[in-house]
Amino acid sequence: MIQTETRLKVADNSGAREILTIKVLGGSGRKFANIGDVIVASVKQATPGGAVKKGDVVKAVIVRTKSGARRKDGSYIKFDENAAVIIREDKTPRGTRIFGPVARELRDGGFMKIVSLAPEVL
């Protein structure tokens, strides 16, 4: 579960390396975000020459969480880190590559471009 002030690794080549969650989108007073949810975040670390700079406020979708997610068949999926992909308003990624595996739950949220760019979908 991701909440306000949570730091996440960025799993794309948009130029950001680490982001800090400002707000969880999707309902008033929503506290936690899980895999496939959209957040508003601030860039805390960035690579030089990237499209995204330190201090930029961006939207991102969560692709991996340590707490994991429960699937309809009763199984759980967990990852070793919390990670997100920076997106545009039309749910397409800002970067051109995705690093590491992503969860199958992104397909249900309409993030097909992220699923197709990912090297592995679990």
From Swiss-Prot:
GO terms for molecular function: large ribosomal subunit rRNA binding; structural constituent of ribosome. The keyword rRNA-binding applies. GO terms for biological process: translation. GO terms for cellular component: cytosolic large ribosomal subunit. CDD domains: Ribosomal_uL14. Pfam families: Ribosomal_L14. Keywords: Ribonucleoprotein, Ribosomal protein, RNA-binding, rRNA-binding. SMART domains: Ribosomal_L14 (SM01374). The keyword Ribosomal protein applies. It comes from the Bacteria. Belongs to the universal ribosomal protein uL14 family. PANTHER family: 50S/60S RIBOSOMAL PROTEIN L14/L23 (PTHR11761), LARGE RIBOSOMAL SUBUNIT PROTEIN UL14M (PTHR11761:SF3). Binds to 23S rRNA. Forms part of two intersubunit bridges in the 70S ribosome. Part of the 50S ribosomal subunit. Forms a cluster with proteins L3 and L19. In the 70S ribosome, L14 and L19 interact and together make contacts with the 16S rRNA in bridges B5 and B8. This is Large ribosomal subunit protein uL14. It comes from Streptococcus sanguinis (strain SK36). The gene is rplN.
